[in-house]
C-alpha cells in the first residue's frame, strides 16, 4: 500500500442544496455568507469528479453551496456535508508534516531554477530524501535535487543527487526578460544574486564594453549584450560556455557583439591587453581580488565591479590590502549578502585610476 494513500482528511462543513435551475437564487440568498476555503470551490457540482477531494455526503441535488456556520434562510436550510480531502489537495509541506517523523523538520524553503527544485537537506532529512523528493516533485512537477557536497572545484559546481523526477538537469531559466540555459550538474548558478545582477545591469549603457573573465552561463554578460554593449566573455568551464552560446541563440541576441573564450582568467586577460574596456566584472569570490592589481594598470580608467568573500572577524580594507597590496576607501565597499555565519560577500566598485592611487 502506498503511504500517500493515508494522506487524507475529512472536513465537516455546512452547505445549501440546490438544483441547477435554482442555482442563481440559492447563491444570491447565500450572498456574503458563502464560505471560502483554500483550494476548494465554494459551489460544488455533486456529479463532477474533483482531483483534490470527494463528497462523502449523499444528496439528490446538483449543487452544494458552502456557507458559514450560523447561516439562516427561510427557504434554504443548511445541511451537514463531509468532504474527504485527498493527497492531491495538500501542499508539499502539509503532506510532509503528516508523514515525516515528528523530529524531522519539513524543508521550509527551496530554490527553483527552471524545471529544477534545489533543496539543501540536513542529516535527518537526508534519511527521508526519497519521500521528500517524491512529494516535492508531485506538488511542483519539477525535478528535485539536493546538494550532497560543498563547492570544491574551479567551476563552482557541487555534488548533487536527484531525489525526484527526471534526472536530466539541463534547463531553461527565466530571469527578468532573459532566458538562461543552465546545466545544473556542471555549472554554477545562484538565484540569490538576481537583484544584485539587476543593479549591475542598470549601470551599463549601449555601446560600452564589458569584460567578464568568469562569465559562467552569462548572468551578467547576457543582460549587457541585450542592452547593446560590446561583451568579452570568458570561462574555464567549457560546459558553461556551451550554455552561454545556447542562451544567445534562444534570446536571439546579436552574436557579432560578443566574443567568447574558454581560457584561464590570466590567459584571457592577456588576450584583452590593449583593448578598450569600460567595465570589468569580477565574480569568482574566492579569487577575484587576485586580479585587481593587474586591472589597476589598465588604460582608459575602466570601472571595476569586484565581488569577493571576507570573514566577519576580519577588517575588510586590511584584508584587501593583504591580498592585493592595494589600499581602498571603505566607501567603495558594500556588503552584498551573508553566505555563512562567519563569511560575507562584498562588492568593491571603483575605477582603475583609484586602484592605482591605492598602490602600497
UniProtKB/Swiss-Prot annotation:
* One protein family per Pfam: TYW2_N_2
Q: Which InterPro entries match?
A: MeTrfase_TRM5/TYW2, SAM-dependent_MTases_sf, TRM5-TYW2-like_MTfase, TRM5/TYW2-like_N, tRNA_Gua_MeTrfase_euk
Q: Which GO terms describe its biological process?
A: tRNA N1-guanine methylation
Compartment(s): Mitochondrion matrix; Nucleus; Cytoplasm
Q: Carries keyword Cytoplasm?
A: yes
Specify the species.
Encephalitozoon cuniculi (strain GB-M1)
GN (gene name): TRM5
Q: Which GO terms describe its cellular component?
A: mitochondrial matrix; nucleus
Q: Cross-referenced PANTHER family, in alphabetical order?
A: TRNA (GUANINE(37)-N1)-METHYLTRANSFERASE (PTHR23245:SF36), TRNA METHYLTRANSFERASE (PTHR23245)
As recorded in UniProt, its EC number(s) are: 2.1.1.228
**Where do the annotations place S-adenosyl-L-methionine binding?**
197, 235-236, 283
List the molecular function annotations (GO) for this entry: tRNA (guanine(37)-N1)-methyltransferase activity
* Described function: Specifically methylates the N1 position of guanosine-37 in various cytoplasmic and mitochondrial tRNAs. Methylation is not dependent on the nature of the nucleoside 5' of the target nucleoside. This is the first step in the biosynthesis of wybutosine (yW), a modified base adjacent to the anticodon of tRNAs and required for accurate decoding.
- The protein's superkingdom reads Eukaryota
Per the record's keyword annotation, is Membrane included, yes or no? no
What does the record give as the reaction this protein catalyses? guanosine(37) in tRNA + S-adenosyl-L-methionine = N(1)-methylguanosine(37) in tRNA + S-adenosyl-L-homocysteine + H(+)
Subunit and interaction comment: Monomer.
Q: Which family does it belong to?
A: Belongs to the class I-like SAM-binding methyltransferase superfamily. TRM5/TYW2 family.
| Keyword tags | Cytoplasm, Methyltransferase, Mitochondrion, Nucleus, S-adenosyl-L-methionine, Transferase, tRNA processing
Q: What protein name does the entry list?
A: tRNA (guanine(37)-N(1))-methyltransferase
Amino acid at each position: 500500500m502506498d503511504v500517500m494513500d493515508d494522506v487524507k482528511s475529512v472536513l465537516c462543513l455546512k452547505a445549501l442544496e440546490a438544483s441547477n435551475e435554482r442555482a442563481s437564487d440559492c447563491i444570491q440568498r447565500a450572498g456574503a455568507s458563502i464560505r471560502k476555503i483554500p483550494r476548494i470551490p465554494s459551489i460544488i457540482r455533486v456529479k463532477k469528479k474533483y482531483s483534490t477531494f470527494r463528497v462523502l455526503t449523499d444528496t439528490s441535488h446538483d449543487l452544494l453551496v458552502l456557507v458559514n456556520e450560523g447561516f439562516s434562510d427561510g427557504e434554504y436550510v443548511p445541511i451537514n456535508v463531509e468532504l474527504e480531502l485527498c493527497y492531491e489537495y495538500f501542499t508539499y509541506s502539509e503532506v510532509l508534516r503528516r508523514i515525516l517523523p515528528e523530529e524531522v523538520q519539513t524543508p521550509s524553503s527551496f530554490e527553483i531554477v527552471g524545471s529544477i527544485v534545489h533543496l539543501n537537506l540536513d542529516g535527518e532529512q537526508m534519511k527521508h530524501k526519497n519521500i521528500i523528493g517524491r512529494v516535492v516533485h508531485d506538488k511542483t512537477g519539477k525535478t528535485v535535487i539536493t546538494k550532497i557536497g560543498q563547492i570544491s572545484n574551479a567551476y563552482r559546481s557541487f555534488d548533487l543527487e536527484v531525489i525526484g523526477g527526471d534526472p536530466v538537469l539541463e534547463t531553461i531559466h527565466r530571469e527578468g526578460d532573459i532566458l538562461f540555459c543552465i546545466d545544473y550538474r556542471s555549472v554554477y548558478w545562484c538565484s540569490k544574486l538576481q537583484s544584485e545582477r539587476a543593479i549591475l545591469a542598470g549601470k551599463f549603457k549601449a555601446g560600452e564594453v564589458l569584460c567578464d573573465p568568469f562569465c559562467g552561463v552569462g548572468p551578467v554578460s547576457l543582460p549587457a549584450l541585450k542592452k547593446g554593449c560590446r561583451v568579452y566573455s570568458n570561462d574555464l568551464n567549457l560546459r558553461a560556455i556551451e550554455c552561454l552560446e545556447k542562451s544567445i541563440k534562444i534570446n536571439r541576441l546579436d552574436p557579432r557583439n560578443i566574443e567568447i573564450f574558454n581560457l584561464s582568467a590570466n590567459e584571457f586577460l592577456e588576450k584583452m591587453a590593449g583593448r578598450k574596456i569600460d567595465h570589468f566584472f569580477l565574480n569568482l569570490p574566492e579569487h577575484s581580488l587576485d586580479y585587481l592589481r593587474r586591472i589597476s594598470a589598465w588604460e582608459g580608467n575602466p570601472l571595476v565591479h569586484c565581488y569577493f568573500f571576507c570573514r566577519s572577524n576580519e577588517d575588510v580594507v586590511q584584508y584587501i590590502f593583504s591580498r592585493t597590496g592595494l589600499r581602498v576607501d571603505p566607501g567603495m565597499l558594500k556588503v552584498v549578502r551573508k553566505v555563512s555565519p562567519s563569511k560575507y560577500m562584498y562588492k568593491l566598485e571603483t575605477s582603475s585610476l583609484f586602484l592605482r592611487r591605492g598602490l602600497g
